[in-house]
């Protein structure tokens, strides 16, 4: 009898776990579709003509057209893409070049008062960026950096550096200390330890950090609009040109947004494995 009761209890527990697992799976799929639906609607609108984009109620079935994409590419999207690509790549390279040694000094070979340094990095993210636009604009004006890609490179490097230091530090803390001690016993200096031992292990975390910084840099609009809107607009600033006083070109704006999202989506797809490994590397002790 005891065996039968135990079997029924185990079966009931497994059934409850099965139902709970399917419930959370359903919740995850619903959340995923809620987040994905605006992107799907943007892509569908991009293949519509302007007349179809304005219909109420919206048309689900329509004749696909590449007219708006041709308008986007003929409207001078090349220079903004070049500006965004240059600013994103150079700023991320600078962030990694500064962030990796800083994270090393705050984790493996911790400097004095390292907690205060970490708090300083975190405190810089608490400042409202809007309050800094006027002094930043004045400094850029006096240095001749308005409508210059290097103004955004310097700015985005400063914005992304605290986040990069925090993330890379959490990844470096997961590296076994025994490996570092063995490398030091073998005579490895600081450079060899960093490049031959630490970076090969932490490369997924570094890749995840770099991709997050690229996404922020590529999508940033506020400072790019005020500092480079006249001669050197980035992709987000270029997209605003489709919002005009005589009317909103929704299909063309959706096509421009789809084109603007493509490089980031492609980079995320290529680095998907590294991104997942990197984001999970520092999550579990």
Kindly give the residue locations of the regions a language model identified.
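A hydrophobic, multi-pass inner-membrane permease signature
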Residues: 2-285
């Amino acid at each position: 009898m005891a065996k039968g009761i135990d079997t029924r209890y185990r079966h009931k527990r497994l059934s409850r776990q099965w139902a709970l697992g399917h419930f959370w799976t359903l919740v995850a799929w619903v959340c995923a579709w809620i987040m994905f639906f605006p992107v799907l609607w943007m892509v569908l609108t991009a293949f519509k003509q302007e007349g179809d984009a304005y219909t109420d109620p919206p048309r689900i079935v329509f004749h696909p057209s590449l007219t708006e994409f041709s308008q986007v590419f003929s409207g001078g999207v090349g220079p903004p893409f070049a500006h965004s690509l240059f600013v994103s790549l150079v700023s991320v390279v600078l962030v990694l070049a500064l962030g990796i040694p800083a994270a090393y000094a705050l984790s493996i070979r911790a400097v004095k008062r390292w907690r205060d340094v970490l708090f300083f990095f975190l405190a810089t993210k608490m400042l409202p960026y809007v309050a800094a636009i006027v002094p930043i604009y004045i400094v850029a004006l006096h240095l001749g950096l308005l409508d210059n890609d290097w103004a955004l490179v310097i700015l985005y490097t400063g914005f992304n550096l605290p986040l990069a230091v925090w993330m890379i530090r959490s990844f470096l803390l997961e590296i076994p200390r025994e490996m570092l001690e063995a490398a030091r016993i073998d005579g490895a200096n600081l450079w060899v330890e960093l490049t031959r031992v630490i970076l090969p292990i932490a490369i997924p975390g570094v890749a995840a950090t770099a991709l997050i910084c690229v996404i922020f840099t590529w999508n940033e609009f506020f400072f790019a609009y005020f500092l480079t809107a006249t001669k050197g607009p980035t992709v987000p600033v270029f997209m605003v040109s489709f919002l005009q006083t005589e009317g909103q070109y929704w299909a063309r704006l959706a096509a421009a947004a789809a084109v603007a999202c493509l490089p980031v989506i492609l980079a995320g797809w290529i680095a998907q494995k590294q991104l997942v490994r990197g984001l999970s590397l520092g999550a579990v002790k």
